[in-house]
Amino acid sequence: MMKINMILSCMLLWLVSACTSQEVVEITVSPEVTNAGYIGNGAEWDPYDEAEAWGASISDKDWETLCKRLDFMKPQYIRCMINSPYRYYDSETGTYDKTRNIASISRLLRYCTERGITVMYGEYNPPTWDMKQDQKWVDMSVDYLNYLVNDLGFSCIKYFVIFNEPDGNWASTNGDYEMWKQMLFRFHRKMKEYPGLTEKVMLAGPDVVADYKNEASAYDAEGWVKQTALDADSIIGLYDVHAYPGQNEVRTGQYPEILSRYKRHVPEGKKIVLGEAGYKYWRDADSLLMAEYNRRVEGHPFTKGSDCNMLCYDYFYGLDMPLLAMEVMNGGYSGMAVWMLDDAMHSSGDSGKTEDVKKWGMWNILGEEVFNKPDEEQIRPWFYTWSLMCRYFPAGTDILHTAVASEDKDVYVVAGTYQGKLSVAMVNVGEKDKSVQLTLPCPMENASLYKYEENLQPKDADGFPVPQETGFHLKGTYKTTLKAQTFQLLTDIQ
């Protein structure tokens, strides 16, 4: 009998332990607005400058596929950059033709205009590096901008970038802040010559890379933002930086401090966005990810890996991208464009060759036509969560204050209201399931819950997310189990 009692006692202890093994995480969403008028989340979507050089333009069928995917995703903010030798500048003759190769960029900008998407447009570099201070480039570039905005009516273009990452040693500016600043004012003066252009389009900058310092430059990235605010705020409509953190520094909660370094220099009344955002694994803490990256690059048929994220195929990338967005949104930034939408946009150095393609996207729409890899055209896992972060935090969302009571830093959350509706996104990057008790600032009517788990990603026939639960009503609290390494989004936006 004693033996039986001992067995029963052990079983009872095991059951109690099992029932209480999940840590309770209390999340409180208050009605306090911490970041008003969010511009939105989106992606880098460049107009397939190299496609024809690779041997295939984007077909009508592929455009239909792209539009269908984007119509579900509802990006609120697109960064669209061109290489002028593939557009208005003929390198062989040195001549300007604004109608040259206009079809694909027109199609892209028409899509954004018709759907009210904010576009940050610009040029990666001048037509040739020797032209970086040439008035001819300024004249051509601004005339082309005016052609797109005023002549063709692409009113989606709200911001204009004159150099991509001018602080970089890979840029034609090579970190020369003074030269960049002078060119910024020259571009602005030229824009003012076109009636109404500066009322429709404002300059964005400095477009520098966070956590980077070019030895040839007088300033690190923070210094660039600070000096831009001091020297050129009168002509800057939107501040932007690029961010490529490591997984470990974001998952361990270090990134808000890094983001704040740039935000604190932005003058009151102005906004700042991430013009590009992705992950790179060169830091020591991410060495295992880097080893896997290198393994995948070795012998790859169409990339050497010089500018890629070979892990964008993986489930975990669908946790890391919304996690970064949560830090951005809670950190007072106004938007984030992921790098990038589609592998079919760039090769390293924009060489026009397919031997070293930049693989960062949610798919490669030219997988079959150019690379003889039809599977590359399929949607990758991270589209699941990123599309939800775009769709359910529309332009104009007010980001709310959230508090997470937890023993560790495994659970992250962001919440926002839009026209009286609420969206709450949560991610658990830890190794244990969490019992979440969510306190809401208002009731939710006809709410939906989306779940992204490694073995549970409900989708429709097109591969788009569908909610795990629908039609429920919440008075002010909600309880759920947020499993280890998973994402959930709760919304009553229809």
Language model segments and positions:
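Bacterial Sec-dependent N-terminal signal peptides
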Residues: 1-23
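Mature N-terminal, pre-catalytic/accessory segment of carbohydrate-active enzymes
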Residues: 19-64
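Substrate-binding cleft and catalytic face of glycoside hydrolase catalytic domains
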Residues: 70-248
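Noncatalytic carbohydrate-binding groove/subsite architecture in carbohydrate-active enzymes
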Residues: 177-327, 331
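Aromatic/acidic polysaccharide-binding cleft in carbohydrate-active enzymes
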Residues: 279-393, 397-412
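Carbohydrate-binding surface patches
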Residues: 406-445, 452-454, 485-489
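C-terminal accessory region downstream of the catalytic core in glycan-modifying enzymes
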Residues: 438-472
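C-terminal beta-strand-rich structural cap/linker in extracellular carbohydrate-active enzymes
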Residues: 465-494
